[in-house]
Curated annotation (Swiss-Prot):
Name of the featured protein: S-(+)-linalool synthase, chloroplastic
Note on cofactor: Binds 3 Mg(2+) or Mn(2+) ions per subunit.
Boundaries of the annotated transit peptide in chain numbering: 1-46
Domain notes: The Asp-Asp-Xaa-Xaa-Asp/Glu (DDXXD/E) motif is important for the catalytic activity, presumably through binding to Mg(2+).
Entry keyword set: Chloroplast, Lyase, Magnesium, Metal-binding, Plant defense, Plastid, Transit peptide
PANTHER family registered for this protein in UniProt: OS04G0344100 PROTEIN-RELATED (PTHR31225), S-(+)-LINALOOL SYNTHASE, CHLOROPLASTIC (PTHR31225:SF0)
Signal sequence range: none
Keyword Chloroplast: yes
Length: 595
């Protein structure tokens, strides 16, 4: 296992350093750009949202200067060797705990606690055999129904994450009074309250005990911060601001490590391995970012479509956070290119094309024929050539690695995205106001989430040839949930992020039109309830060991559902604007995970 870990890291780093860039057959030309102001019939809906904040999305000079800071091959070799040695140390510790567990009952609790630390540090996959052995179902069941709040809630979380059926009401009922309220003697159990707060976000719907758990733990942790010692107070504050289940684990891991380093009893090997792991992952992501940056600069679309968003770092952050693991480096790079085209095509529809041009653009995509785009403006032809090349390259890569060529399914996914954008264009040009539910259904498609995840599904080697058409036509909940969460969050932040001319709609705006007696705050609260409902549905999909009830014939690999969950976790970060129209949490994520 250890050798596999390091060969995965080293081979991924070498591939990023040496792999040739997958460039389009012809780069876009900046000399033939088309100004949206000169295009008759064009409707500018997002004219103020054409350039990102430099504080969050550094420009080319900043990114170029950063590339000179990358370590040498010798530095990489030293990092990998240290990671290998520390992994051996932690593995030896886990084996020692296993032997102790065989002798004493308390050893089981120690092993479960270690598994929790490894998961919070995003390192459990290096020790999968040991983790599986420690996750004894009988022990977890015993702890979940015991009388210790920390043990019970931790066991509940681990069991639910593993797909086991476990009742929140049964587990938490032991800690409530006759009225179903949590007993007051748990108000001072800080670690128990933190664990209770963790599981309160794992609601799969109609779990009243978890709603009460969230209210009870939040209220008492907030009041406890004032008297806790500083290190624990910071950890509690961070846990409340960024709840474990709905936050990116990579980000939480850094804060968990900082907390572990303040404890009187420490596991030095595990802490040092976490630091080495952070360094290697950051290095790998920096190299991936450099390759994507080179591809984007050589492509030339930023010069040809100057009003379009030029946010290479933002596009990469989506994939960096959703798809984890050194072995999936190439997957992150190629899917970042797909994400970039979603943004560029959105801007072409919003800012550049007339309805007639966009209709022809959509038809060319349906035909998947470059010649069909000959009559289009230069920027559209260049965009089509680029996305056509990248998509075909991905299909060829999937065929080489997995023996299936998914190009027909990928073409259909692209056509679905363009049809969704075309629907919005028709609404706008005709002055038509869709109802909120119709808007949201189309918004799932135009979010780009289904398109990206269709590509991901095939790149992971999952053969859905029997039902891929159904996957595209009837988007499964594991994809529609993060897509709806993204669309609704985006709409909540659109007033801060965009200055729109005309009504291309937001769910909140349309809902207010349908309910004229509501105040804006009530409509926003309705949207937040919808987001919470989508999280509950996504939890059901991710925590169920059986196929989805909505699509019983379809099961997805664990890496796929984890990516969907991570995408949902990142939405609030990507659209969490503060009062000054900044994204401070995203800035913190990027600084911590990439630079």
């Amino acid at each position: 296992m250890v050798c596999h870990v390091f060969s995965s890291f080293s081979s991924s780093l070498i591939r990023v350093l040496e792999a040739p860039l997958l460039l389009p057959a012809a780069s876009a030309s900046s000399s033939s750009s088309s100004s949206p102001a000169s295009r008759s019939g064009g409707r500018r809906r997002r004219a103020a949202h054409v350039r990102p904040s430099p504080a969050i999305y550094p420009g080319r000079q900043e990114l170029a200067s950063h590339s000179s800071m990358l370590p040498t091959d010798f530095d990489i070799k030293v990092l990998i060797e240290r990671h290998e040695a520390l992994t051996d140390d932690v593995q030896e510790m886990l084996q020692h705990q296993r032997r102790r567990h065989q002798k004493t009952a308390s050893g089981g609790r120690e092993r479960i606690a270690t598994v929790d630390h490894l998961r919070r540090l995003c390192m459990d996959h290096y020790f999968q055999d040991e983790v599986d052995d420690a996750m004894d179902a009988c022990l977890l069941e015993e702890l979940a129904h015991g009388g210790d709040l920390l043990d019970a809630t931790l066991a509940f979380r681990l069991m639910r994450e593993a797909g086991h059926h476990v009742s929140a009401d049964e587990v938490l009922g032991r800690f409530t009074d006759d009225n179903g309220e949590f007993r007051l003697d748990y108000r001072k159990d800080i670690r128990g309250l933190l664990s209770l707060q963790d599981i309160s976000h794992m609601n799969i719907g109609q779990e009243a005990s978890l709603c009460k758990a969230k209210e009870f733990s939040t209220r008492n942790l907030e009041s406890a911060i004032n008297y806790l010692e500083p290190n624990l107070a910071r950890y509690v504050r961070q846990s409340l601001d960024h709840p474990y289940h709905v936050s990116l684990n990579q980000y939480k891991a850094r804060h968990h490590l900082s907390y572990l380093q303040t404890l009187p009893i420490r596991c030095t090997a595990m802490e040092e391995l976490a630091l080495a792991d952070f360094q290697l992952n950051k290095l790998l992501h920096q190299m991936e970012m450099q390759e994507i940056k080179r591809w984007w600069m050589d492509l030339g679309l930023a010069q040809e479509i100057p009003v379009a968003r030029d946010q290479v770092q933002k596009w990469f952050v989506w994939m960096m956070t959703a798809i984890q693991g050194a072995s999936l480096s190439r997957c992150r790079i190629e899917l970042t290119k797909i994400v970039s085209f979603v943004y560029i095509v959105d801007d072409i529809f919003d800012l550049v094309g007339t309805r007639e041009e966009l209709s022809c653009f959509t038809q060319a995509i349906r035909m998947w024929d470059l010649a069909a785009a000959d009559s289009l403006p230069s920027c559209m032809r260049s965009c089509f050539r680029a996305l056509h090349t990248v998509t075909n390259d991905i299909a060829d890569m999937v065929e080489r690695e997995h023996g299936v060529n998914p190009i027909n399914h990928l073409k259909k996914a692209w056509a679905m995205l363009f049809d969704g954008f075309m629907t919005e264009t028709k609404w706008l040009s005709a002055g038509q106001v869709p109802d909120s539910e119709e808007y949201l259904r189309n918004g799932v498609v135009t979010s780009g989430v289904p398109l990206v995840f269709v590509h991901l599904l095939f790149m992971l080697g999952h053969d859905v040839s029997q039902n891929a058409a159904e996957f595209v036509d009837h988007i499964p909940p594991v994809i529609s949930c993060p897509a709806k969460i993204l669309r609704l969050w985006d709409d909540l932040g659109s007033a801060k992020d965009e200055a729109q001319e005309g009504l291309d709609g937001s769910y909140k705006e349309l809902y207010l039109k349908e309910n004229p007696g509501l105040a804006a705050g009530e409509a926003e609260e309705h949207v937040r309830r919808l987001i919470a409902g989508e999280w509950e549905e996504l939890n059901r999909e991710c925590f169920s060991a059986s196929p989805s009830r909505s699509s019983p014939a379809t099961t997805f690999p664990a890496g796929f559902t984890q990516a969907a969950l991570n995408a949902a976790r990142m939405v609030g970060v990507m659209y969490g604007y503060d009062g000054e129209r900044r994204l401070p949490v995203l800035d913190d994520y990027v600084r911590m995970l990439l630079f």
